[in-house]
């Protein structure tokens, strides 16, 4: 079956694995999924990124992070914002602050995929892919 929204699929896989306290999860590799994973790692939501497989079947293995003795997931919520049927674009001034700055909005800009903080620093807007907190 064809996957019509690979970003939503990636976010759902991470969310489900995190709720079940898995050590890692696999997502199909693409340039966009690599970029999103890199932003999540830079912001401290995932521990590590590695690749497994070859060619079309390449997958990203994302190591998930937990905190405290009860292993609470670092990722509490992931919400897809811009969807294939309704794209959401924001300029620099319109970029959202997730949870008053405690969360991260992942933005696809002309300079690549980055967090909302980086987009504000560079003075660029773009498509708001998702919120993570």
Swiss-Prot record:
Pfam family, one: Ribosomal_S8
SUPFAM superfamilies reported in the protein's UniProt record: Ribosomal protein S8 (SSF56047)
GO MF annotation terms: rRNA binding; structural constituent of ribosome
Residue ranges, compositional bias (Basic and acidic residues): 16-25
Domain of life: Bacteria
Disulphide bonds in the chain: none
The protein, known as: Small ribosomal subunit protein uS8
Gene name of this polypeptide: rpsH
């Amino acid at each position: 079956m064809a996957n019509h929204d690979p970003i939503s699929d990636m976010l759902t896989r991470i969310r489900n694995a995190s709720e079940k306290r898995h050590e890692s999860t696999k997502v199909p590799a693409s340039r966009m999924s690599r970029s999103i994973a890199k932003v999540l790692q830079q912001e401290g939501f995932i521990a590590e990124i590695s690749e497994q497989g070859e060619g079309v079947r390449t997958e990203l293995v994302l190591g998930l992070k937990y905190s405290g003795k009860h292993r609470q997931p670092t990722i509490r919520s992931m919400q897809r914002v811009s969807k294939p049927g309704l794209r959401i674009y924001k300029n620099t001034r319109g970029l959202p602050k997730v949870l008053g700055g405690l969360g991260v909005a992942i933005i696809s800009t002309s300079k690549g995929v980055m967090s909302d903080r980086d987009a504000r620093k560079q003075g660029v807007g773009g498509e708001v892919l998702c919120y993570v907190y």
